[in-house]
UniProtKB/Swiss-Prot annotation:
This is Small ribosomal subunit protein uS15. One of the primary rRNA binding proteins, it binds directly to 16S rRNA where it helps nucleate assembly of the platform of the 30S subunit by binding and bridging several RNA helices of the 16S rRNA. Forms an intersubunit bridge (bridge B4) with the 23S rRNA of the 50S subunit in the ribosome. The keyword ATP-binding does not apply. The keyword Ribonucleoprotein applies. The gene is rpsO. It comes from Caldicellulosiruptor bescii (strain ATCC BAA-1888 / DSM 6725 / KCTC 15123 / Z-1320) (Anaerocellum thermophilum). Part of the 30S ribosomal subunit. Forms a bridge to the 50S subunit in the 70S ribosome, contacting the 23S rRNA.
Length: 88
């Protein structure tokens, strides 16, 4: 679970302007952080299928947001996946 301070740091890093909290970039960055933390949890607790389902839902949501951003502005999409280290 992200603390309020960690969430604010991620928002500041990826926001497009001063009051931006809901742009696709910010949403994707927050989801990526939550996904990474849940992955660590699932490596320690292999039989936690409840959390695994939540992980799959988050990955699907991130996929939808990435597809939207890719169709809307390909340059912002490429910049974001480079920053987040997605797509090897």
């Amino acid at each position: 679970m992200l603390t309020k301070q960690q969430k604010e740091e991620i928002i500041k890093k990826y926001q497009l302007h001063e009051s931006d909290t809901g742009s696709p970039e910010v949403q994707i960055a927050l989801l990526t952080e939550r996904i990474n933390r849940l992955n660590e949890h699932l490596q320690a607790h292999k039989k936690d299928f409840h959390s695994r389902r939540g992980l799959l839902k988050m990955v699907g949501q991130r996929r939808k947001l990435l597809n939207y951003l890719k169709n809307y502005d390909i340059n912002r999409y490429r910049e974001l996946i480079e920053k987040l280290g997605l797509r090897k």
